[in-house]
Each structure stands twice: as structure tokens, then as C-alpha cells.
Regions:
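Core beta-strand-centered patch of the WYL/Sm-like small regulatory domain
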Residues: 2-125
């Protein structure tokens, strides 16, 4: 019997594949990060000099370590350690983004959502 990924422990490889696919397909995800629920749009997946996987993402909902994300209508750009993500799954909803400074999250980039403009499910809307 297959158990849904969200109902069991996910490996780092499974989470990497899900986050990478979400970036390529411009799909939002939900995940726990250090035990707090986050709603994220992963934009860049890569690793830093020590080889630690990182996700540069736009957090548009959920919690932060300091409490709920402010209800200002906008989100926050985050650089998250992939190894700290758990219970990750794609969710239905619009791809969210806003202008940002050049990312310094990952030194070696594996995937950048900007390289896949045709994947936007909103067709640029």
C-alpha cells in the first residue's frame, strides 16, 4: 500500500525533487521549516560553498520563527536550508513573486524558476 508523502517521513532527496519540480513548474508548496508551517514559492535551488543545499523562496503565508507572517498583503524572501524542510507538498494556488535583490542564497545554482517562464500556470497574469 502506498502511503502519501505528507503522511510519512520524506528523505532529503524526495524533498529536493519536489522543491526542484515546484520551481520549474512555478507551483507553490507548503512545508514545515524548523517545525513551523510555511507557504512558499521556491525560485532558486542550489548549494553554498560547504555544499549545503539551499532554497531561495518567496514566503507568502504561514508562520515564521517569530510568529505569523505579517498580514500586509506581501511576502518575504527567504533563504532556507533544504535539510530543515519536512512534510513538503505542492499546493494549488497562484505562483507568487515580487522584485528582489540578487540572491546570495546558493553559490552553485541547480535550478532557477526564471529559466522556465513558459511553466507559469498563470501565463504571466
Amino acid at each position: 500500500m502506498n502511503v502519501p508523502a505528507s503522511a510519512r517521513e520524506q528523505s532529503t532527496d524526495e524533498i529536493y525533487r519536489l522543491v526542484r519540480a515546484a520551481a520549474v513548474q512555478h507551483r507553490p508548496i507548503t512545508a514545515l521549516y524548523d517545525g513551523t508551517r510555511r507557504l512558499l514559492c521556491p525560485h532558486v535551488v542550489g548549494y553554498n560553498r560547504p555544499g549545503d543545499w539551499r532554497v531561495f523562496c518567496y514566503q507568502y503565508g504561514g508562520e515564521t520563527k517569530d510568529g505569523p507572517l505579517p498580514v500586509s498583503g506581501g511576502g518575504i524572501w527567504r533563504c532556507l536550508a533544504l535539510i530543515k524542510l519536512s512534510s513538503a507538498e505542492c499546493v494549488t494556488g497562484p505562483w507568487r513573486t515580487e522584485p528582489h535583490a540578487p540572491q546570495r542564497c546558493g553559490e552553485h545554482i541547480e535550478v532557477d524558476a526564471d529559466d522556465y517562464p513558459g511553466a507559469d500556470p498563470q501565463n504571466g497574469q
